[in-house]
Amino acid sequence: MWRVCKLCRSAAIQMTSNLPETTSKLEGPLVKQFSVFLPNKVGAMLEVVKLLSVQNTHVVALSVSESTDSAIARIIASDPTRVEKLFREKNVPFGVSQVVVVELREVATQLVKLLAALVMAEVNVHFAYPLLIRPRGFAAIALHVDDTECASSVLMGEGFKLLSQDDITR
């Protein structure tokens, strides 16, 4: 069942041929996140990071969640095309999804504003994690949400700077 967020639905009803600036599209693609399925053993994460490092591809963001037998490493990399090709060649089990990456100039106040905007738009955050780099000198957070288009539109409308894959590629 498809769901349209409350704010995006009301914005769509009010839209005319003159689109407001807040509905503009991001320059460049959204950010690709790789979910890598790893055995829960010592050194498994190191193997993946070394595989990328040898190919001069940098881990830009990382989050790991574990269970008894396995772990899922969520990775944002500097060159997603190379990563996808490499994972396929080396038979690394993975999935790909899109995340919204938001720059936070003042984390203490902006994080509350960001989450409140998503709640008002009825956008669910599945998980979030910080970037390891500061692409433009500020903190940034990756958000896996149930509606990337609505989240992007709402956050841009609230004045947040969204980062594209081009912004984080080194």
Question: What does each model-found stretch correspond to?
Answer:
Residues W2-C5, R9-R170:
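A conserved regulatory-domain signal marking ACT and ACT-like small-molecule sensing domains
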